[in-house]
Amino acid sequence: MQPETPPLWRGPRWALAALLAVLGMLGPFSIDTYIPAFSGIARALGASPVEMQQTLSAYLFGFAFMNLFHGALADSFGRRAVVLWGIALFTVASAGCALSQNITQLVFFRALQGVSAGSGMVVSRAVIRDLFPPAQAQKVMSQVTIYFGVAPAIAPMVGGWLLVHLGWHSIFWFLTLVGVLLWLLNFRWL
């Protein structure tokens, strides 16, 4: 890091692992949160099972494809910029999913979610590498990985609860809210 570069982490050290964990779990969480609503979304949008599968495939393709580039973008433009732009795009895409009136719109916005959701996962690992010596980085990475593994377990329960009580649109509004909160936290602390 160059001397004139501002510090990457401006908050308390204990909070870094929590923030990086939430950044890392955004991708898997947004995959599994809407899975319980597949049949409800299909009925509401008049979509076939294949079309519903495309909402997941579009997300995964965008997620995998952009994982190739998020690291290089973060090296070129800075960790903070890539995370903030990624979360902002994720938030807009989540709102787009909630407002989708047909399956084509939903597939498009799910692809945008995928393109942007991976930024947190890639950059969180780069931040750990930047801030910690190797032995300490392993400990922080193990904490982050635990939360990363928890996301797919709790996401369907959250999505199912939202579906039952508030309808399928609420799942994507919830993800929009998560995006807004995550953006604000990163804007303040990263």
Q: Residues of each region from the PLM?
A:
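Residue-level signature of mid-helix packing/kink "hotspots" within the transmembrane helices
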Residues: 32, 60-68, 152-153
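Cytosolic juxtamembrane N-terminal segment immediately preceding the first transmembrane helix
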Residues: 1-27
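Helix-loop-helix hairpin linking two adjacent transmembrane segments in secondary transporters
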Residues: 105, 142-188
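Interfacial helix-cap and linker-helix signal at transmembrane-aqueous boundaries
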Residues: 41-42, 73-74, 161-166
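Conserved MFS/SLC helix-loop-helix module at the cytosolic interface between two early adjacent transmembrane helices
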Residues: 65-104
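Cytoplasmic helix-loop-helix junction between adjacent transmembrane helices
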Residues: 109-148
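Extracellular/periplasmic helix-loop-helix junction of adjacent transmembrane segments
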Residues: 37-65
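Small-residue-rich transmembrane alpha-helices and their cytosolic helix-loop interfaces
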Residues: 24, 56, 60, 141-149
